[in-house]
UniProtKB/Swiss-Prot annotation:
Any Pfam family: Bac_rhodopsin
Biological processes per GO annotation: phototransduction
Protein name per UniProt: Sensory rhodopsin-2
CDD domains for the chain: 7tm_SRI_SRII (cd15029)
GO terms for MF: monoatomic ion channel activity; photoreceptor activity
InterPro entries assigned: Arc/bac/fun_rhodopsins, Rhodopsin_retinal_BS
Localization per Swiss-Prot or TrEMBL: Cell membrane
Family: Belongs to the archaeal/bacterial/fungal opsin family.
UniProt subunit comment: Interacts with HTR-II.
Record flagged with keyword Cell membrane: yes
Lineage, top ranks: Archaea, Methanobacteriati, Methanobacteriota, Stenosarchaea group, Halobacteria
UniProt topological domain (Extracellular) ranges: 1-3, 56-69, 118-121, 183-190
N6-(retinylidene)lysine modified-residue sites: 206
Length: 236
């Protein structure tokens, strides 16, 4: 358990550092984007609380002979919808598609948790439902939301949307693999290894997502200012 605590502590430090960087980045992005940028700060900010609790030994229950970290699922229930909400806002998606996207992502986590605390074979059925719901998330991100992005954004902004979308989708696809191989599934991956992998994924997906968006938003802001200068000169 000492090893697991170490991984949680490292995860906490990673989320703290990432939140600090993103909080500073708030002052660097264009004012018109700051409202949605707050979502990027909130994502690792919420994870700080979750990892602090897990590092201190709180937030887990025993189910079917293995530990289930309830706090981790609460973290995901709150943060992963924020990731897809940011993508929908960036793309200028409709309210209907945005709500569908956020709800489907939240339900994916709910069914993943339900599967983790339920004996097999029901656990696998619940896991499959969660997987199907996540398939709906992927469909919306690559279809409806992508169409909205292409119709409303500049080429550079569309590229940012695609980068962030592919980033989270690819990394999020690793989580169900860990679930299946870990204690909740077939048990081929020990708890320490599964914890290490999940901590790494959490820090990369939360902080990495935010940093990629931050750097792109700074560049877009600088490009906008540069484009305005010739106009101002011409007006003079």
């Amino acid at each position: 358990m000492a090893t697991i605590t170490t991984w949680f502590t490292l995860g906490l430090l990673g989320e703290l550092l990432g939140t600090a960087v993103l909080a500073y980045g708030y002052t660097l992005v264009p004012e018109e984007t700051r409202k949605r940028y707050l979502l990027l700060i909130a994502i690792p900010g919420i994870a700080i609380v979750a990892y602090a609790l897990m590092a201190l030994g709180f937030g887990s229950i025993q189910s079917e002979g293995h530990a289930v970290y309830v706090v981790r699922y609460v973290d995901w229930l709150l943060t992963t919808p924020l990731n897809v909400w940011f993508l929908a806002l960036l793309a200028g998606a409709s309210r209907e598609d945005t709500v569908k996207l956020v709800v489907l992502q939240a339900l994916t986590i709910v069914f993943g948790f339900a599967g983790a605390v339920t004996p097999s074979p029901v656990s696998y059925a619940l896991f499959a439902v969660g997987g199907a719901l996540f398939g709906g998330v992927i469909y919306l991100l690559y279809r409806n939301i992508a169409v909205a992005a292409k119709s409303t954004l500049s080429d550079i902004e569309v590229s940012l949307y695609r980068t962030l979308r592919n980033f989270v989708v690819v990394l999020w696809l690793v989580y169900p693999v860990v679930w299946l191989l870990g204690a909740a599934g077939v048990g081929l991956m020990d708890v320490e290894t599964a914890t290490l992998v999940v901590v790494y994924l959490d820090v990369v997906t939360k902080v990495g997502f935010g940093v990629i968006a931050l750097l792109a938003m700074i560049d877009l802001g600088s490009a906008g200012e540069t484009a305005e200068e010739p106009t101002a000169v011409a007006g003079d």
